């Protein structure tokens, strides 16, 4: 049985709290979304700590990124999520975080292409490093476009 929108809301809030507590996001970093059964996207808002969100803070957008439900402003990175959902019909949820170790690799220009941990290879495979794209612009979606069809995780430069 598919989850309800309310169940997805609870899940996103819980994931937000966990990634905040683990130090994978700070301040207003990161964003989370889920593709709903009707094709709309439930996502975190912009300018809000993922550790302190409530279910009412989440926003529903259509497939073009237009807000159709919710009081808050949509994440500036919604176009990145929409591109991933468009290119990957098998993807129904996205978590964009800033774990310190991953951020360090990205800042140093080092992709995670070597089999450092067996668990990472088994679950994610190669994690390529994209070129830099400014948040909320087509630079970002252009930077990830070539990698999305064949990778489940990306390091954003």
Name what the model sees in each region.
Residues 1-157:
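Glycine-rich flexible loops
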């Amino acid at each position: 049985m598919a989850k309800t929108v309310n169940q997805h809301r609870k899940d996103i809030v819980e994931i937000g709290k966990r990634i905040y507590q683990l130090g994978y996001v700070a301040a207003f970093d990161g964003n989370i979304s889920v593709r709903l059964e009707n094709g709309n996207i439930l996502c975190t808002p912009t300018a809000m700590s993922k550790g302190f969100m409530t279910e009412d803070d989440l926003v529903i957008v259509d497939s073009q990124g237009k807000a159709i439900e919710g009081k808050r402003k949509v994440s500036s990175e919604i176009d990145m999520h929409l591109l991933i959902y468009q290119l990957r019909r098998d993807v129904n949820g996205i978590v964009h975080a800033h774990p310190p170790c991953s951020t360090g690799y990205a800042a140093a220009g080092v992709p995670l292409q070597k089999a450092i941990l067996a668990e990472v290879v088994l679950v994610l495979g190669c994690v390529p490093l994209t070129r830099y794209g400014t948040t909320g612009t087509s630079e970002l979606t252009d930077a990830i476009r070539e990698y999305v069809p064949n990778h489940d995780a990306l390091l954003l430069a």
